[in-house]
Amino acid sequence: MPLRLPPRVENPDYPKCLAPERCLAKSLFGGPGCNVYTHSYAACAMFRMLRAIWQGTRKGEFFFPAAEWCAAFHDIGKISPVFQDKIYRALQLAQQLPWSSPIAEQSGGHARCSAITLDAYFDHKNPELIRMAGAHHGISYELTTGDNVNQKDLGGAAWQKMREEMLRRLTIELDLPECGLNSIPKEQIPIMLGSVILADWLSSSLDLGPDSPLPDETILRETIEKAGLIPHQVRSGISFSDIFNFEPNPMQQACLSQIVPGGIYVIESGMGSGKTEAALGIAYELMRRKQADGLYFALPTQLTSEKIYDRLNDFLRKTIDEPDPRAILIHGDSWLEWTLANPDENGNSDLAGSWFQSKKRALMASFGAGTVDQALMAEVRVRHNALRAFALAGKVVIIDEIHSYDAYTGSLLTKLIGDLRSWGCTVILLSATLTSEACRQFAQLNDLPDNSDYPRILLNDHGKIAFIPVPAPETHPVDLRIAGKEEDIFAEVIARAGNGEQVLWIENTVHQAQEIFRRLTALAPELETGLIHSRFPACIRRKQEDYWTELLGRNGGAKRAQNGRILVATQVLEQSVDVDADLLVSRIAPADFLFQRIGRLWRHSGLNHVRPAAAARQCIILAPDWLSDPVQVEKQKFSFSPYSAYWIRRSWEVFQNKKTLIVPSDIRPVLSAAVSAWNGLTSTRPGRTTGCRGNSPPSQSRNDRRAVK
């Protein structure tokens, strides 16, 4: 028996009501699409199918029954004169409306109308559902006392009565469960909203016309599978050496000794020690045990994310039991990768045409590598941040170079890491140069237990803190030298490159790198000299990066043995990029970033046989002589961009008298010395601190660079 609806009461002061079946929700190929009832039913059915497909997985725990109500009711605001006027006129069907003049929008769109309608329908007793319904287009609305159903563009009492009749009909025909939102933790509300947005988008992709039947389970499942939103099958019985083609070192063995779903790992280990493989090894074990549904690898720059992307695809080919499994590259310019990736014989790309080719949807892919800002947008007030939160739910989230972010980004990361645990994620943080205070904050601890070991693996197992013991690693001495001006070392650098050494010269700004490159090529045109920075056009930059990272990478031995070279770069080669140099020249930088640069020296022992006999593991730091004078530092404080003069001066103080660094043993004591002496640096003017504002130390993060270059 069809549900019998009571007659509507029209008010001549408001637009006349349309019949419910004529209230359109969508257009289709330039003509009318399905009505509001069909779309609402389809959205709820799509949500239920998603929940059924993901049942038994980590993400499946977050398809809350209460979200069925929001999926069914989210577009009830489209039953309003203002929305129907808009869609009918857009389809050139205004003559079918029972009014003649266009209706001005007052309420703020159909999402706000949905919130106003539900607020009245539930007698102001379900604020979370109302807020979620109003936010399904990515913007959260807070209702005010002036918001009510009597606004003319909402149609008054007659249209509200029709909307409430539709709500009752959907409740009965969908058999919506008796449940509320009060039992759902506040931090999980965003991922609940994200699941509704996903169901809405998928149901909107169905080609439903005005007379189409309701979609059945076969259509719903095919839509989800076509989008690629299904759990992946992980191969079992694969060892670490099967995946990475080498046996795990002691640090990696320690990481794999304790696999804790939902924990926070902070892995501090030397540059080039295999932290990436350790993190991926943990991720594999969690996915194999069905304690994680995917992973997102977040890095500070586009270049580093692109290099990890290649390694992640190699990892997936070994671990995922599917033909050609691939990750998605996710950063501000990844559209170019999507467009060019793996074209077929007709020049088309399957990846480019995938459902995930959208910055808002890309994180929904089970496996991704990208910049950290893509994950941080789950925390900030941007459109559809809830979908990003839901996309991360249940995954392993690996954040590399966790030390490298500024104070603002660091505070967002601290908040994100805390929420990720509530979203069923396991978080793995990687760094070679993390301060103890930063470790405490990121690990979500009030106090950090005393432990000065290096390497150090901290595990926060839902509040239970453990340090996983790691044997002391092999150490290497690095010769240090400070040069006041680049003119003092040009001849030496050119001579050493001429003798076959691979020289890496890192500057702090693009302008400095360009100038050094210009001068070196003028002095030694016969030498192969390269330049990498973030201002190259994307196609040129990609070509340069691929060439040099292959040449100076783990497998570049044959080519590098042919002749020496000089590569001039900015911080894009500072971290998470696998390049190996015989000699490093670096402009002075904060101590932790200098260590990252030193990590490019003699990175692979397998290349030692092709190094020139005279090569020495050496770093030359370019630092002006006047750094010893606080007054001059104060005057020149803006010349250290993008870094604070304070941290440059502290770095100079700890390195100026060092002739040798023992890596990695010296990393922690040197960093501690660099951040411990705030009162040790004052200008000659009382009450002023050199290069910094205020009377308290700067944040633990000292780099002012953006996260994405």
Residue ranges and their predicted role:
Residues P2-Q233:
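Accessory nucleic-acid engagement/destabilization modules that flank
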Residues P261-A283:
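Walker A/P-loop
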Residues R235-E268:
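Conserved pre-motif I regulatory segment
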Residues D293-L316, H331-S334, L434-A438, V510:
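Conserved Walker A/P-loop ATP-binding site and its immediately adjacent core
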Residues K125, C439, A491-I494, G498-L504, ...:
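C-terminal helicase lobe and adjacent C-terminal extensions/tails of nucleic-acid helicase motors
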Residues P449-A513:
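Conserved interdomain linker/interface between the two RecA-like ATPase lobes of SF2 helicase motors
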Residues I282-Y309, T319-P323, S422-W423:
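Conserved SF1/SF2 helicase motif Ia
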Residues L387-V396, I402-F467:
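Post-DEXD/H (motif II) to motif III coupling segment of the RecA-like Helicase ATP-binding lobe
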